[in-house]
């Protein structure tokens, strides 16, 4: 079996959290980013006055900052929100701070934050 195939087989066996850790380690090791590249902005004609527009953020990340006193309840809510298995949800909660959901709209982010704060978790929306 080639090295590439061996690596693929190893990656297939990793959990979502392990994959996220792998990506982060590769980004740090090789000095790259796994983020999608942003398309270049078209040049503004010279005659037009520069217009400064701030784009409203449309995608948010919900970060579990701390668990609080109700760890089991937090794990249950994380499982409900993410669809993760018990082991993966526990690893996510134990490893706080961790992202619970990424690239969600503002309404969904606020709903997730409310559910987790109701069981005592500390949440941040980025």
From Swiss-Prot:
This protein's GO CC annotations: cytosolic large ribosomal subunit
The keyword Ribosomal protein is annotated on this UniProt entry: yes
Keywords (A to Z) from UniProt: Ribonucleoprotein, Ribosomal protein
UniProt GO molecular function: mRNA binding; structural constituent of ribosome
Domain of life of the native organism: Bacteria
Presence of the UniProt keyword Ribosomal protein in the record: yes
Any one Gene Ontology BP term: translation
Classification via HAMAP family: Ribosomal_bL12 (MF_00368)
Quaternary context: Homodimer. Part of the ribosomal stalk of the 50S ribosomal subunit. Forms a multimeric L10(L12)X complex, where L10 forms an elongated spine to which 2 to 4 L12 dimers bind in a sequential fashion. Binds GTP-bound translation factors.
Job description of the protein: Forms part of the ribosomal stalk which helps the ribosome interact with GTP-bound translation factors. Is thus essential for accurate translation.
Entry similarity comment: Belongs to the bacterial ribosomal protein bL12 family.
Protein name: Large ribosomal subunit protein bL12
Gene: rplL
């Amino acid at each position: 079996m080639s090295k590439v195939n061996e690596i693929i087989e190893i990656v297939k066996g990793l959990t979502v959290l392990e994959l996220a850790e792998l990506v982060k380690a590769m980004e740090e090791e090789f000095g790259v980013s796994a983020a999608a590249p942003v398309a270049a902005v078209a040049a503004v004609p010279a005659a037009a006055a520069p217009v400064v527009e701030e784009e409203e953020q449309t995608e948010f990340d919900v970060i579990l900052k701390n668990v609080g006193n109700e760890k089991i309840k937090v794990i249950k809510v994380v499982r409900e929100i993410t669809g993760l298995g018990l082991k993966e949800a526990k690893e996510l909660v134990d490893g706080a701070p961790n992202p619970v959901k990424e690239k969600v709209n503002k309404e969904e982010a606020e709903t997730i934050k409310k559910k987790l704060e109701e069981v005592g978790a500390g949440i941040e929306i980025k």
